[in-house]
Amino acid sequence: MFRTISRKNMSQKLSFLLLVFGLIWGLMLLHYTLQQPRRQSSVKLREQILDLSKRYVKALAEESRSTADVDSGASMAGYADLKRTIAVLLDDILQRLVKLESKVDYIVVNGSATNTTNGTNGNLVPVTTNKRTSVSGSVR
């Protein structure tokens, strides 16, 4: 008899502990979700990347103009190499952003498909298609 009472008591303690843990976890998740700064859309991020790269290239051009008296041939070759390197890096960043976007869209679509409450599963279409344009051609 004592064992059945202690089992119920342990079960209640464990249930209470799990309930408190779940409540704390839920509150922390809610707090984290509300306190996170809003994410910028990928289009804005792409525009910022391109704008910053243009400014950087302009700054390098001005710097190369100021040092053109010293060694114009080598600095211009270095400038062209640097410009190509930046273009390749920016293209790689944009490709990674597109891949990340497609993964997030896939997760969003599949996550919403598993959480249907009415039991009807319609045809699911990805949220976005591959909207990437060739930006690297305009940068190089």
From Swiss-Prot:
Keyword Phosphoprotein among UniProt keywords: no
Location in the cell: Secreted
Residue stretches of biased makeup (Low complexity): 118-130
Domain of life: Eukaryota
Span list, region Disordered: 118-140
Signal peptide range: 1-35
UniProt feature, compositional bias: Polar residues: 131-140
Keywords: Glycoprotein, Secreted, Signal
CC terms in the record's Gene Ontology section: extracellular region
Glycosylation site positions: N110
Protein known as: Coiled-coil domain-containing protein 126
